[in-house]
Amino acid sequence: MTNIRKTHPLAKIINNSFIDLPTPSNISAWWNFGSLLGVCLILQILTGLFLAMHYTSDTTTAFSSITHICRDVHYGWVIRYMHANGASMFFICLFMHVGRGLYYGSYLFSETWNIGIILLLTVMATAFMGYVLPWGQMSFWGATVITNLLSAIPYIGTDLVEWIWGGFSVDKATLTRFFAFHFILPFIILALAAVHLLFLHETGSNNPSGIPSDSDKIPFHPYYTIKDILGALLLTLALAALVLFSPDLLGDPDNYTPANPLSTPPHIKPEWYFLFAYAILRFIPNKLGGVLALIFSILILAIISLLHTSKQRGMMFRPLSQCLFWLLVADLLTLTWIGGQPVEHPFIIIGQLASILYFTIPLVLMPIAGIIENNLLKW
């Protein structure tokens, strides 16, 4: 009798995706982050669901409802901090996952890669709206500043901003709609993740060498299920350590002050995972130029595959490209640091140089390095 997992319509899909899936035998720990993102997403949906049971999306009670969750709800503080720090873990895994894709040439699976970019943008939108919900000072002013960027769009900008706000300033209507979107978007992310996997399984996974591995595949279960469980355990350990020992490490103290439209915080800044893009936005003097640079700092990923000049797929055997890749990583860390600093000397010039470098490396230097490496192979 044929095994039910191979015949049952629903079990067959799960079997082909997570059990009998032919997987390259040499994929490293860098391939763990996809499953870790799945773990993070499920965790965020579950903790978010329990938070939504106690949260009120009204400007007068939003802040006190968060206080109520932390003080009165049974283990509410754990749920709240797991959700807040879970977002940080989510973005750490996202950056690692995208970095892996860039390093090993996974962007050449264009459908999977493009769905991934849409996923990244959706997750960023969700995280931004979630940051507004506690209705602290940084929530309010962050929402005001970031939504106001749309006013840089010629002709329709101001109308667009007021349409998003639901009035003439960030107020009750804004908070209510942000809560509604923040609740629905994770389920859209879940659906997009399924499409992302669907396209990935059309081609099969890439591997560190970048060489087709059809001749050397092993079943996903038990080899990679065990590996993924280990990754999930380490992630859970890191998250638990963060939540239980220093839950406010990655947060902003200003968000413990209730939102006050009459008092602007000295330094308005978003969560740490947006600081690199925020730094690029800030260090372009022109408003529209800054907004375009901000958008392009993410959308640059969409044209990476067009700039691939090397005859080899990954960077495993390309020392020049490796140097440039790690320079880009260092540059991103520099931008993240600068984004959290005040706009004054010497941070301005460092930010401008780091922003220029951020675009120069993938658009100019990496394609040139690819051509040089191709010619070096002829020697």
Swiss-Prot record:
It is a multi-pass membrane protein. Heme b b562 binds at H83, H182. One of its GO terms (molecular function) is ubiquinol-cytochrome-c reductase activity. Pfam families: Cytochrom_B_C, Cytochrome_B. Its cofactor is heme b. It is found in: Mitochondrion inner membrane. Keywords: Electron transport, Heme, Iron, Membrane, Metal-binding, Mitochondrion, Mitochondrion inner membrane, Respiratory chain, Transmembrane, Transmembrane helix, Transport, Ubiquinone. InterPro entries: Cyt_b/b6_C, Cyt_b/b6_C_sf, Cyt_b/b6_N, Cytb/b6-like_sf, Cytochrome_b, Cytochrome_b_C_euk/bac, Cytochrome_b_N_euk/bac, Di-haem_cyt_TM. Binds 2 heme b groups non-covalently. PROSITE patterns: CYTB_CTER, CYTB_NTER. Heme b b566 binds at H97, H196. One of its GO terms (biological process) is mitochondrial electron transport, ubiquinol to cytochrome c. The chain crosses the membrane at residues 33-53, 77-98, 113-133, 178-198, 226-246, 288-308, 320-340, 347-367. The keyword Iron applies. Its main location: mitochondrion. The keyword Transport applies. One of its GO terms (cellular component) is mitochondrial inner membrane. A ubiquinone binds at H201. Component of the ubiquinol-cytochrome c reductase complex (complex III or cytochrome b-c1 complex) that is part of the mitochondrial respiratory chain. The b-c1 complex mediates electron transfer from ubiquinol to cytochrome c. Contributes to the generation of a proton gradient across the mitochondrial membrane that is then used for ATP synthesis. The cytochrome bc1 complex contains 11 subunits: 3 respiratory subunits (MT-CYB, CYC1 and UQCRFS1), 2 core proteins (UQCRC1 and UQCRC2) and 6 low-molecular weight proteins (UQCRH/QCR6, UQCRB/QCR7, UQCRQ/QCR8, UQCR10/QCR9, UQCR11/QCR10 and a cleavage product of UQCRFS1). This cytochrome bc1 complex then forms a dimer. Heme 1 (or BL or b562) is low-potential and absorbs at about 562 nm, and heme 2 (or BH or b566) is high-potential and absorbs at about 566 nm. Belongs to the cytochrome b family. This is Cytochrome b.
